[in-house]
Structure formats: structure tokens, C-alpha cells
Amino acid sequence: MEWIINQLRDHPELAIFLTLFAGFWLGRFKIGKFSLGTVTSVLLVGVLVGQLNISVDGPMKAVFFLLFLFAVGYKVGPQFFRGLKKDGLPQVGFAVLMCIVSLIAPWILAKIMGYHVGEAAGLLAGSQTISAVIGVASDTINQLSISDAQKATFINAIPVAYAVTYIFGTAGSAWILASLGPKMLGGLEKVKADCKELEAKMGTSEADEPGFYTALRPVVFRAYKIDNEWFGKGKTVSELENYLVENDKRLFVERVRQKGVIEEVTPDMLLQPGDEVVLSGRREYAIGEEDWIGPEVIDAQLLDFPAETLPVMVTHRTFAGEKVSTIRALKFMHGVSIRSIKRAGINVPVLAQTVIDSGDILELTGTKLEVETAAKQMGYIDRPTNQTDMIFVGLGILLGGLVGALAIHLGGIPISLSTSGGALIAGLVFGWLRSKHPTFGGIPEPSLWVLNNVGLNMFIAVVGIAAGPSFVTGFKEVGFSLFIVGALATAIPLLSGLLMGRYLFKFHPALTLGCTAGARTTTAALGAIQDALGSDTPALGYTVTYAVGNTLLIIWGVAIVLLM
């Protein structure tokens, strides 16, 4: 054991990977629905490893933190700038107000309790579950005109306060929004009914059973043998498809076999009893059609044709701001189904009245030719790739860091975004540029996950190890009262957001809950809300507010230091 400890001291990089391994492993465990989460687990393991007095020096901590912040900005950039347009301003205004409350509440509570700047920053980071504040606040503290010893004391106190307040910040947020939230908006059953009404209003063609997640329904291809009298002496392909649409069944004839020969499908092709047809569309539309068309047939030859699902980034201005129903009706969408819509990494319900934004990723499914034709009309085919444009990433962080390093002096105090704030802003701008010009700057989802999660947790691991020797002393100083203060700092902005959404902005209850979760950037709470309501509609209010909230709450790491 002593040999292992000595090796960790001699090779601190191994201590970091020990922290990552154990932290990610611990973060997988759940008690009921509660989990510490990866970030808190990595921090606590880092604190334990730090008891071995391991010195972790060098720029590695800053490097990984900058990668993380750039990834955060890159992910939400398109939606952040999209929200600044006229129709997104109410949600932007809501997010800004709620973020201001999210800063003021911890600040006032910290002043009342007599906390120093490090404890206040940790309170903000943990109660609002915005881990990046740890790094941004640390950078800002390092710019203060105080002794190095004071800087170290303040910076080492941040993870202590963060760890104490993060638990309720996560679990409490989900409980408040999923349990108290619906009650404050008229009661759970009323809000559920309001969600079903919104779903019906936004797209009556979608199935409306409780808990039916439209974005996750697969598209299927099924074959039937025609034997219904409705076809009489024959119906054309277009007549059959129009009849299906009139009955809220958006299905397409993809293949026809007549007299044993598979024929090319045309709109005026005559379908007669005995013919075999392949229909494509959402599963809920295709199931049951054999009751009137005819029996389903399982025929490998008939169903053996190229089908494709393509992710398409919407870049053409013609389609930005259009509803799903409008896009579905376009000629080039014949035979093509929208399988899912992703916005800032969040699945948005596929309803007839859902508005498509520039930068949205649409999954289109159908035959290879039809899907590729539709994809080229709508935007850029974002085919899966394993290559990250590191020229784009490196240049973005460099330029952002240089801008963030610029400082203005107020009363002799240098004030700047810091290199970390600059990297975040660069990520926003570069992510937006990528949505407008998708031929460059690509970062695949797995790579973005690595930049986001490994970047943050590498940083947190180093923070935990460095704070380890002073963590226990710091915890004794703040005491259990900090947990109560943290719970108040978590609850006040959330309750304020619910009241603002209902009475000031007069949002729909589903949007109020989604906007509140988004402004606080708590994805776990969004999932809890959707489970409680049995509806995906709260996600419609999440993406814009998440983009704004993620940006402002990180910048508040600078603000809380200056306010204290």
C-alpha cells in the first residue's frame, strides 16, 4: 500500500485517473431515484485522494476546463442566438430574470451568514448545480489584489461549499419542479390535462395516450395483400394515400407487386385486389391497417429494398420557423417521415404544430432516394463521423481566451471575463457559426461528450485533490447550516420562476415548468417533470432557457466574486 501511495505522489497524473475511475463508478449508484451524480462523486473521491498530500501542478486543470466550457457553448450556441429573435424573446426574458434571482438569492444568503467569497461562490455553484462556477470563480479570485494565502483559502473553500449544497441542488430541484410545481400551477391533474390539450392543439394527428413519446416512435415498413371491396375495380396509389391522410394516417406506398412482378410505384398506378403493397410510416399508423386493406404478408423479397435514416441539420432559411405540418405537406417529403427532432441535444416532441428552428437536427426516415432528396432540400446531411475539427476547436479556444484575458480597471480592480469566460463565449459563437455553415467545425456527439464530461471531471478531480488537505477543516467551519442555506438558495429561484411563468409571462403550465428547468440547466428535473406529467411538451420551453441559463450562470462565477 505504501508503494502505491508513493507512486501516486511521484506520478500525480495517476492520482487523477484513480479519481476519475472511482468517481465515475460511484456516480453510477442510485438510492431510489437519487444519485450523487458523476461530478459530485469525482469531487468527493478527489478529496479523499487529496488526503495523501498529492501535489498536482501545471496547466492541465485549466486546459481541460477550457475544453469543457468551449463544448458547453458550442452545444447551446445555435439556440442561444435563435432565442434572441422576436418570437424567442419572452423565454429569453424569463431566463434572464430567473438567472438574476439565482445570483441574488445565494449572494444575499451568503451576506446574511457572513460567508467569505469562496464559500459564497461554492454556495452559488452547488445550489444552482452549475459546476463551471468553481473554475470561473477561482480564476476571478486569482485576479484579486489579495495575498496568495488568502487566495488559496478562498479557492479551497469553493469545493467544500459546493459539495455540501449540490445534493439538494440536484435532488431538491427535481422534487420542487416535478411535485410542487404542478400544484402551484393548478394541480397535477389539471396540468396533465393542459398538456394533453396542448398536444392536441399542436398536432391532432399524433396519438394521445398518456406517456406516449412521439419523438421516440420508430418508422416501419409493412406489406399487405389487398382484398378489400373498397378497392373495387381499382384505386390509384394517390387515391389510397389521400384516403389514409384524410383518416389521419400519414402512410405511403413504397412498393407494389402485381401478378408476381415488383413494379415501380407511380401516383397513378392502379391498385387492385390481389396486389401486394408495402406501406411506410410511423408504427402507430401502420399497425392495424390490415383490418381493411388486407392481411399482412411477410415477404423477404418484397421488403428487401434500401431504406435509410439520416440526421439532417436544418440550414435553409426557408424552413426555419415553419411548422412540422407545413414541412410534411411539401412535395419532396412524400414517403419521408420525421423520426425525431433534436434541439441543443434535447429531444423535442414531433407534433404537427412544432416549429422547426435553424440548427435543429431532424432524423428523416424512408427509402434511400426519397430521404436523400428531402435532406438536400432542407439542409446539411450530418452523417455520423469520428473526426473532430480540431483546427476549429483550437482556434475557438485561443481567440476566446485572448478576448477573455482583456481587462478593464474599475477603482483599481481589474475586471475581465477571464480566459474561461472567453472560451464559453467563443463556444457560443463557433457553435452558431457551425449551424449556419455546417461544412466545417464538426464535433461528433461522442467527441462532444468527451470534451464536456471528461473536460469538466478532469478539472473537478484536480480541484478535489488540491482541496483535500483542507477539506475537513473547511467543512467543520461551515457546518450543517450551510446545507439549509443551500436548500433555500435552490428553492427561492425555482419558486420565483414558477410564479413568474404563471403570472408575469402567462406561459402554458408545461412551458412554465420546462422554462424553469431550462433556466436552471437541470436536465434531471426536466426528466422528472416529463415523467410526472406523462408528456414531452415541457421540452418545448427548455431549450432556449437552457442556452441562456447555461451562459449566464457560468458568468455569475465572476459576478459573485465581485459582489462579495
Curated annotation (Swiss-Prot):
Intracellular or extracellular location(s): Cell membrane
GO biological process: potassium ion transport
Lineage top rank: taxon: Bacteria
Family annotation (InterPro entries): AAE_transporter, Asp_Ala_antiprt, RCK_C, RCK_C_sf, YidE_YbjL
Entry's Gene Ontology cellular component terms: plasma membrane
UniProt KW keywords: Cell membrane, Membrane, Transmembrane, Transmembrane helix, Transport
MF GO annotations: monoatomic cation transmembrane transporter activity
Lipid bilayer topology: Multi-pass membrane protein
PANTHER family: K(+)_H(+) ANTIPORTER SUBUNIT KHTT, PTHR30445:SF9
Family: Belongs to the AAE transporter (TC 2.A.81) family.
Designated name of the protein: Uncharacterized transporter BT_0736
Species of provenance: Bacteroides thetaiotaomicron (strain ATCC 29148 / DSM 2079 / JCM 5827 / CCUG 10774 / NCTC 10582 / VPI-5482 / E50)
Lineage: Bacteria, Pseudomonadati, Bacteroidota, Bacteroidia, Bacteroidales
